[in-house]
């Protein structure tokens, strides 16, 4: 889901109910989603910096012939999310990874932006400190629409920085 527990596909719910282990960023967030949809499965939290021993646990489950689902706190695993490290290591060990598409914040915002999105740039999350001004300089100098993710708590700060870098825009 992309911030609303109802933004989830029937297929995603089926996968979650049929898998043997659910890998998540934060068990508290995953438990809320699973509770809402009456799903009870073992959870393994792998936060921002994936610990090798936790990824080894995922590989052990896969080696035993079981199925693992990867979730994220909001959005799509691997898109500006720590899930990419898990996926990379699972693929490197020869396991097949299948995407389960669903709602996307990126697609949602582009659909209502009111600008030509034939071509655009996605930047992920801006750095918190070092490199922040450089990140936003690239944003204001872009000739195509730029989309990036950000916490609602930093939006005003971002707008102030953008205004100082490109007051004419």
List where the protein language model places each region.
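Glycine-rich, flexible N-terminal cofactor/catalytic loop recognition
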Residues: 1-48
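Short glycine-rich anion-binding loops that position phosphate/pyrophosphate groups of nucleotides
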Residues: 2-4, 73-77, 127, 152-154
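Short active-site oxyanion
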Residues: 16-22, 94-97, 145-146
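Alpha-helix capping/helix-boundary segments
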Residues: 28-30, 75-76, 105, 154
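Conserved helicase motor
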Residues: 45-52, 125-127
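Short glycine-cluster motifs
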Residues: 63-122
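Beta-strand/loop-alpha-helix module characteristic of Rossmann-like adenine-cofactor folds
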Residues: 107-169
């Amino acid at each position: 889901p992309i911030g609303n527990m109802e933004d989830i596909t029937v297929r995603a719910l089926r996968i979650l109910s049929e898998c043997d282990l659910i890998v998540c960023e934060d068990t508290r967030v995953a438990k809320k989603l699973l509770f809402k949809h009456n799903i009870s499965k073992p959870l393994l939290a792998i936060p921002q910096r994936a610990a090798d021993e936790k990824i080894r646990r995922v590989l052990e489950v896969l080696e035993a012939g079981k199925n693992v689902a990867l979730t994220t706190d909001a959005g799509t695993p691997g898109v500006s999310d720590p899930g990419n490290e898990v996926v990379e290591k699972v693929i490197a060990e020869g396991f097949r990874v299948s995407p389960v598409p669903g709602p996307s914040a990126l697609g949602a915002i582009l659909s209502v932006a009111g600008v030509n999105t034939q071509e655009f740039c996605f930047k992920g999350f801006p750095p918190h400190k070092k490199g922040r001004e450089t990140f936003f300089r690239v944003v204001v100098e872009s000739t195509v629409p730029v989309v990036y993710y950000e916490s609602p708590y930093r939006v005003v700060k971002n707008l102030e920085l953008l205004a100082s870098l490109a007051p004419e825009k």
